[in-house]
């Protein structure tokens, strides 16, 4: 009797996960494992270290803002790349696009982002310096130039772009001057990006993001660079998602 109940429960769980995967945007269900699918279904933020653009798990052509996110990473040929996905029900969250615009255009929020290095057991502001240099506004479009310092790296100039409309929401940030670690040029101009979109699919809203860098892959320290990079992308994205007022 107990074996029968366990078997029935497993069959039901498999059926529910299969039904859920069929409601996902194309390719998520093809590329992901069951743990990732289950996490997305439960409202967890999924973060994947995919290293290169060929490993992106969503395909072009579904939504123009998805295409812009992918193109942003493609254009720099990122060789350190993280993919972030979050799902929320559409019902009760119809204001999410307006929320996203309001949150991402406020660059002063950068000062509140905390980076936590769990391996070293320390936390610090991710951006200890943020200064707005210029701002341009048009219909459903904003561009902001800023001067930023990221922890452990030099100060640099950055531009962010926000666009929104029927397809959803799009955000892009890119460095406009090089980043240095001590005297070493760690990232060339334009080679560090964060690109985020929010779109509706099959009764749900999805936040999809790529954070990437084109930088030297130095033997013996690649794993440590990836660990710290993924940690920063995670803290940046999680911070903003938690700023949204989401109903589940």
Name each region found by the language model:
Residues 1-6:
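Bacterial N-terminal signal peptides that target proteins for export
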Residues 8-15:
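Bacterial N-terminal signal peptides
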Residues 16-23:
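Bacterial Sec-dependent signal peptides at the C-terminal "C-region" and cleavage site
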Residues 158-195:
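Hydrophobic-ligand binding "helix-grip"
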Residues 182-187, 213-231:
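A short acidic/glycine-rich loop-to-helix N-cap element
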Residues 188-214:
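Compact beta-sheet-dominated globular domain cores
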Residues 221-248:
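Alpha-helical oligomerization segments
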């Amino acid at each position: 009797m107990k074996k029968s109940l366990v078997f029935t429960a497993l069959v039901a769980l498999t059926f529910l996960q299969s039904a859920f995967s069929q409601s996902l945007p194309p390719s998520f269900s093809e590329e992901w494992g069951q743990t990732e699918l289950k996490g997305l279904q439960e409202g967890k933020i999924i973060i994947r270290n995919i290293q290169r653009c060929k490993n992106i798990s969503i395909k072009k052509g579904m939504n123009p803002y998805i295409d812009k996110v992918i193109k942003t990473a493609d254009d720099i040929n990122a060789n350190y790349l993280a993919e972030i996905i979050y799902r929320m029900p559409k019902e009760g969250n119809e204001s999410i696009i307006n929320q996203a615009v309001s949150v991402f255009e406020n660059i002063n929020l950068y000062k509140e982002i905390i980076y936590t290095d769990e391996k070293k057991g320390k936390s610090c502001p991710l951006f200890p310096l943020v200064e707005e240099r210029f701002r341009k506004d048009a219909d459903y479009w904003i561009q902001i130039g800023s001067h930023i310092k990221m922890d452990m790296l030099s100060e640099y100039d950055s531009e962010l772009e926000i666009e929104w409309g029927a397809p959803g929401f799009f955000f892009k940030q890119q460095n406009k001057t090089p980043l240095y670690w001590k005297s070493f040029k760690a990232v060339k101009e334009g080679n560090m990006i964060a690109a985020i979109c929010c779109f509706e699919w099959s009764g749900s809203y999805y936040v999809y993001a790529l954070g990437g860098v084109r930088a030297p892959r130095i033997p013996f320290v690649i794993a440590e660079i990836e660990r710290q990079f993924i940690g920063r992308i995670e803290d940046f994205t999680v911070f903003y998602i938690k700023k949204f007022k989401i109903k589940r």
